[in-house]
Amino acid sequence: MTLTSITAYRESDVEQNADSDFTSADLIGRNYNKTNIETFTQEVRLTSSGEGPIDWMVGGFYFDETVAIDNEFFFGSDFRGYADFLSGGALAAVEGALSLPVGLVFAQEGQGMVEEFGQDNTAWSVFGTLDWHMTDRVTATLGLNYTEDEKDAYGNIVNTDVFSSLDLVAIGFAQALGGFGVDATDPAQVAAFAGANPGAFAAIQAGAQDPASNPLLGLQALQFLPPFLGFPNSVEDGQSSDNDLTYTFRLAYDATDNLNLYASYGTGFKATSWNLSRDSRPFASDFTAGSPVTSPGSSPIRDAGLAVPNLTSGTRYAGPEEARVIEVGAKFAYDAFAFNVAYFDQVIEGFQSNVFTGTGFALANAGKQSTQGLEVDASWNVTDELLLTFAGTFQDPVYDEFPNSASGDLSGKAPSGISDTTTSTSATYTFDVNTLEAFIRADWQYESPTAYFDDPANQALIGNQREVNTWNASAGFTTENGLGVTFWGRNIFDDDYVTVAFPSVAQAGSLSGYPSQPATYGVTVRKSF
C-alpha cells in the first residue's frame, strides 16, 4: 500500500481600479476592488499495491477558505450632466420640488457605494474507488464520494447615492394627497382621509404606481444604486449547509490489443454559491417588494423593520446543483494512428447561472440544463516528420427549464456562449538542419456561431453572434546546447470578433465588449540549462 499526503496553502490578493464606463466621459470616477482569498487544503490517499484482481484507493479531503472583498464605486465629475441629459433636466426639477439646493444633491461626484462582502467556507469529503479486473480484458470501476460543505457569508454597503434612495412612489403619493390638503407625513391625517374617502384613497395609491399619473416613475431607471439590506440580519442568517453522495460506475472492455470500449455513468455535486455583490437581494419568500404607501402586505423582512427604500426581491445565493453524465466511447490506436470518440449525455439540475446586469450580478438556479453530443480526437503520424491532429466537440445544449432567469423564461432556449461545434486542427512538420532540430506548425481553431446573451433584448442590440475562425502558425529550431528560437504568428488572417459582451455600466440600452486579439507576430527565445 502507498500513503500519500498533500498539504497546500494559497493566498491571492487582487487590487484594481477600473474605468468601467468605457467612455471618455468621467461617469464612473472610481470602481475599486480589493479581494483577498486564503485557502488551505489537506488531502490524504491510501492506494493498494496493485496485486491481484482488485485495485482500490480511499482518501479524504479538507478545504478551508476565507474570502474578503472591499469595493468602492463612486460617480465621476460628468455623471450629473449625463443624468441631466438622460432625464431632460428632471433631476433639477425634483430637487426644487423637494426644496433641495438645485444641482447640488443628486448624482454628485463622489456619491456611490462602499461595499464589504465575504465568506468563510469549510468543506470535507471522503472518497474511494475500486477497480475489479473481471478478466484480462474487462474492468469494472466503482467510485464513491461523500461531501459536506458549509458557508458563512456576509455583505454590507454604505450608500451615499441620494437620488437612488428616494421612494418616488411615496413622493408621488404625497404630492397627490397634498392636493387634498393632507400631510402624508402625518399618519393620523392619512388614516382620517382614507377612512372618509376610501375610493379616492385607493385611486391615489394606484396612481402613485402608474407612470401616467406619477411622472416621477420615469426616473426610476436612473436609480442605479438603490439602498442595500446587509446580511446576516434577524431574518437572513447568511449561512448554508449542503451535503451529497456522488458516485461513478464504469465498465471497460479491451476488445482487441488496439481497441478499448467503455461506458460510464456518473453523478456530480456543486454546493450553494453566494452572491457576493451589490446585486444580492432577499428572496421573495422573505420580502414582498413595494413602497410602504401601497400597502404591499406582510413579509418577514418588512415585519422585522428591516426594509429599506426601493428594496426588491431576488436571490442571495444559488442553491446546490447536481449533475448526471452518461458516456459511451471507444479508444483505438494502431501503429501511427490514434482515434478516440465518445458520446455524452449530461443533465444538470439546478444549474447555477450568473449574469451581469450592468450594475451587478444576478445569481440564480436554472431548473434544468442539458447537453448531448460527441467528442472526437485523432492523431496521425503520416510520416516520421509529419503529424496531423484533430479534436472536436459537437453538442446540443439547452435550458430545459429556466422560467425565472434574470432575462425572463429561457426554457427551451440554447445557453449563450456555448458553441454547437468546436474544433482544433493542426499540422506539425519536424526536420533536422545539420545539428538543429527544426519544426513548422500551423493550427486552426473554430467555434460555431453562438449568442452573446441569454437576454433576447441585449442579443438584438448587438445584432450578431460570436464565431471564432482563427489560424496560427509558428516555426523554430533548437540547438544542441539547449537554445530554442520560435517565430510565431497568432490570428494571422486577422479574424475579428468580440470575445465577451456585457451591458454597459449604468448605461441602459448600451453594450460593451472586448475585441479579439488582432494579427500578432513575435519571436520567443529560450535556453535550457
Functional labels for PLM-detected ranges:
Residues 1, 44, 52-56, 136-140, ...:
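Outer-envelope beta-barrel architecture signal
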Residues 56, 136, 336-338, 343-348, ...:
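Gram-negative outer-membrane beta-barrel transporters
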Residues 73-74, 80, 385, 445-457, ...:
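C-terminal beta-signal and adjacent terminal beta-strands/loops
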